[in-house]
Amino acid sequence: IQELEQEVGVTIFNRTNRGVTLTNDGRRFLHYARQVYQQYELMEQEYLRPKKRIFGVSTQHYSFVTKAFVETVRQFDATRFEYAIRETRTIDVIHDVAQRRSDIGILFRSRHNRTVLNKLFAENRLEFHPLVECSAYVYLWRGHPLAKNESITMDELCAYPCLCFEQGDQSSSYFAEEILSEREYPQMIRATDRATMLNLMVGLNGFTLCSGIICEELNGTDYLAVPYQEDKDNQNAKMEIGYIQPKNTELDEIGETFLREMKAYLGQQK
């Protein structure tokens, strides 16, 4: 300590036969020394200590993906991994996986958007792997006037707001998260998250058109999916839900576990 005092030119401690106390210069010195040490610890953590494996999923707004993610996280040591799940816009799902921000992306193809999405997959060197194919369902809250119907037609829906997820600058129907997005609806309301969407269903008797694969454990039991009834002017369409990953890559153990959990849940819903 005396050598350090000589080197920096200040007295850090007052020394007496009763012990030592900090001088004013000493307190100032320790203040800066503590900051330097904390910076050193940050650098050590970033560059010297073993790094955690980061596992990320980007997805359109599907509650079953969150369910599979939860079950996956429960199976691994949280001290060895950092996790991220991003419910986001369609184009961001693609970009996140292409830029390796996420390991897997979950979205759907249909007859309407297949050509556009396949082109984007090719441009970004991504592969699409189908998981499940399903027809359109009307998703609404249990207090909705149409909730007790065995099926619902487009004519019946016209009296209520159609809810969809905001896609930002990519507002084309090719990037919509809802099936039958190419149709014209008298009333349209856009939202950015599932919680707001559910609130609008209750507050405005809104509806959305989806796969019908709903996780009640996460969304609650106040909502239900009713089959969409097509007619000659308003045909039904198939949703092909799947995942994307970079070409010529393999998922590690945690990625495979996530896929297994997702497939298991989708299998139960069938």
What residue ranges belong to the model's regions?
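Beta-alpha-beta core module
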Residues: 123-129, 134, 195-247
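A bilobed periplasmic-binding-protein/Venus flytrap-type ligand-binding module shared by bacterial periplasmic
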Residues: 139-147, 240-251
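A short LG(V/I)-centered, amphipathic sequence patch enriched
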Residues: 3-22
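Hydrophobic hinge/microswitch elements
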Residues: 98-101, 167-224
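Flexible hinge/capping segments at coil-to-helix
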Residues: 120-162
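N-terminal winged-helix
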Residues: 52-95, 253
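Alpha-helical linker/hinge and terminal dimerization helices associated
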Residues: 7-8, 29-51, 55-56
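Secondary-structure junction motif
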Residues: 65-69, 110, 114, 150, ...
